[in-house]
């Protein structure tokens, strides 16, 4: 059994080394599309992230812990607590 495991591990390592040694370098045609450094940062489009104020109250309202989750959220922000108003928005107290 030990011999079999040693053989399998050795075989896997050999396959990895052979696959790396057979890798073909990229040709110059692919280098034209590669963007590096500061230019790459300028060309990257920013991702759109939504900040949903109602996530704490609306998503957790079905579990019955909506006000507790809102209060915990406000405590983590450094406020004295909070509550969910009628529109489902977490309102933190000062």
UniProtKB/Swiss-Prot annotation:
Its main location: secreted. One of its GO terms (cellular component) is extracellular space. Keywords: Antibiotic, Antimicrobial, Cleavage on pair of basic residues, Defensin, Disulfide bond, Immunity, Innate immunity, Secreted, Signal. Residues 24-54 form a propeptide. Residues 1-23 form the signal peptide. One of its GO terms (biological process) is innate immune response. Disulfide bonds join 57-84, 70-90, 74-92. PROSITE patterns: INVERT_DEFENSINS (PS51378). Changing residue 86 to R: In defensin B. It comes from the Eukaryota. SMART domains: Knot1. CDD domains: DEFL_defensin-like. It is found in: Secreted. Belongs to the invertebrate defensin family. Type 1 subfamily. Responsible for the anti Gram-positive activity of immune hemolymph of P.terraenovae. This is Phormicin. It comes from Protophormia terraenovae (Northern blowfly). The lineage of its organism: Eukaryota, Metazoa, Ecdysozoa, Arthropoda, Hexapoda.
